[in-house]
């Protein structure tokens, strides 16, 4: 940074301290704010809390300050909710008041300042995008249309693993093959396309760009520039890389998928009764003038981020827990053989008549919640919550992981014990019928992908347990399940090697 920029930054910082001090005094008189650590001018609680606002750190603050607390992160108010009652207020009772999304310098780049559905503010654009995306992606009709493809992709995974001699001896990093499976599951729905192998050049390029986007967006290192605008000049290099990755990704989506599908549609007659992939419905909405080309590309962006990776994380967590709990793995295998018969491969309709499989999935989503803090909510106007005043445009985080892992509400929550969902928690479902357990959220901004994720999880985990004994690599009794938290995500730190010994029927 040159001296002129540094001088401007320091002058701006000094001015901001004066302004922040005045504003802080005025707000202190006006609002009854939630409790929290004492902030300092300009930086707020950032110097105390740091950038790493993960679910476990915020759970520790909840134990200290209570079910609702306030962090002043630079010039932003961050309100953290950690009880089922207040989660219900934010997500359901006052769902309209708290239904918007906060702005973020990095996500503004990757979503074109909210031209997508997932990260846009609450309003007419969000309602339109949600409606346009629901029919081609998130209905039972879609499940029934594509479940055969999901079953085929799971069968291909089993076949490829059996062909690999390393899998039964030294072990393999199964995640790599499962990643290809998840891309194929979703790209079949989106574009009626699939990738033949992990070495497919287009798949390699797509995976690399999506991975870079996730790394840039999920990291904590840019928080300081988001919380404290006067420090944003220090983010120039980071934001430039974000813009470059965003442009390359959108161009890839356009050139290789959206435009290719347009060409296919122009040469083939498709009426409303013929089978269409999701992008055909999206392009129809564009032709009607409901959305523009950028919206189309940002819908593709959302599916790449919000559907593929999150489901993959959950599959990976489920497999890791089964490797580390062989008694649970055996119990699940016994259920599959008893209900379906030895060697009878699980299909989507079977998943609903296998209660222990359902319990394993629920427990995976409870202990290893893919989006532990949800995407941040925001109130556009001043609001009330838990007896406190919430200033307009506050960032609201619901610590869904803590709701599902609070020892005051759950018996031995640190244990991976699927039986809890067949015993004391037998009435709890993943659809949000209990505000202690919200793996997909609830209300207006809930994740509509639940209708796809649950059957894919059931088919994939079921097929693997049926066909293989899942073991840690030679010389180890367990695999490492250390967590890696992100801005909103929770995935496994190390993609572990596991041994898959084929079973005979």
Swiss-Prot record:
Signal peptide: none annotated. CDD domains: CYP73. Keywords: Heme, Iron, Membrane, Metal-binding, Monooxygenase, Oxidoreductase, Transmembrane, Transmembrane helix. It comes from Catharanthus roseus. The keyword Hydrolase does not apply. It is a single-pass membrane protein. This is Trans-cinnamate 4-monooxygenase. GO terms for cellular component: membrane. Belongs to the cytochrome P450 family. GO terms for molecular function: heme binding; iron ion binding; trans-cinnamate 4-monooxygenase activity. It is found in: Membrane. InterPro entries: Cyt_P450, Cyt_P450_CS, Cyt_P450_E_grp-I, Cyt_P450_sf. It holds the Pfam family p450. Heme binds at residue 447. SUPFAM superfamilies: Cytochrome P450.
């Amino acid at each position: 940074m040159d001296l002129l920029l540094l001088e401007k930054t320091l002058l701006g910082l000094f001015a901001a301290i004066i302004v922040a001090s005045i504003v802080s005094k005025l707000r202190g008189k006006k609002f009854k704010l939630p409790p929290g650590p004492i902030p300092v001018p300009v930086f707020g609680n950032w110097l105390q809390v740091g950038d790493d606002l993960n679910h476990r750190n915020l759970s520790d603050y909840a134990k200290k300050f209570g079910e609702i607390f306030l962090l002043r992160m630079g010039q932003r108010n961050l309100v953290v909710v950690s009880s089922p009652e207040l989660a219900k207020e934010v997500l359901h009772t006052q769902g309209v008041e708290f239904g918007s999304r906060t702005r973020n310098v990095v996500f503004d780049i990757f979503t074109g300042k909210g031209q997508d559905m997932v990260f846009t503010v609450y309003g007419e654009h969000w309602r339109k995008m949600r409606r346009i995306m629901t029919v081609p992606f998130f209905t039972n009709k879609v499940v029934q249309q594509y479940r055969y493809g999901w079953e085929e992709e799971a069968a291909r995974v089993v076949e490829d693993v059996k062909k690999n001699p390393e899998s039964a001896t030294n072990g393999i990093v199964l995640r790599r093959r499962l990643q290809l499976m998840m891309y194929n599951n979703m790209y079949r729905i989106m574009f009626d396309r699939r990738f033949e192998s992990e070495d497919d050049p287009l798949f390699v390029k797509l995976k690399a760009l999506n991975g870079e986007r996730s790394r840039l967006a999920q990291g904590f290192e840019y928080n300081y520039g988001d919380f404290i605008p006067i420090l944003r000049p220090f983010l120039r290099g980071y934001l430039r890389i974000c813009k470059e990755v965003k442009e390359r990704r959108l161009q890839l989506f356009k050139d290789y998928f959206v435009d290719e599908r347009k060409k296919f549609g122009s040469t083939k007659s498709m009426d409303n009764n013929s089978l269409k992939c999701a992008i055909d419905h999206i392009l129809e909405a564009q032709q009607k003038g409901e959305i523009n080309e950028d919206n189309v590309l940002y819908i593709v962006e959302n599916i790449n981020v919000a559907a593929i990776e999150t489901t993959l994380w959950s599959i990976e967590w489920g497999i890791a827990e089964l490797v580390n709990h062989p008694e649970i793995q055996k119990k699940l295998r016994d259920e599959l053989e008893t209900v379906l018969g030895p060697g009878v491969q699980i299909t989507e309709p079977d998943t609903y008549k296998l209660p222990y499989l359902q319990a394993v999935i629920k427990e995976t989503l409870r202990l290893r919640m893919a989006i532990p803090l949800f995407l941040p909510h925001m109130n556009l106007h001043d609001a009330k919550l838990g007896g406190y005043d919430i200033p307009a445009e506050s960032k609201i985080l619901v610590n869904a992981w803590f709701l599902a892992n609070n020892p005051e509400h759950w018996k031995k929550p640190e244990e991976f014990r699927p039986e809890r969902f067949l015993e004391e928690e037998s009435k709890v479902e993943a659809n949000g019928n209990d505000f202690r357990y919200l793996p997909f959220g609830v209300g207006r901004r809930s994740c509509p992908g639940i209708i796809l994720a649950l059957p894919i999880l059931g088919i994939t985990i079921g097929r693997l347990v049926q066909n293989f004994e899942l073991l840690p690599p030679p010389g180890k009794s367990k695999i490492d399940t250390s967590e890696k938290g992100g801005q909103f995500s929770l995935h496994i730190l190390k993609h572990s090697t596991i041994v898959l010994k084929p079973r005979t029927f």
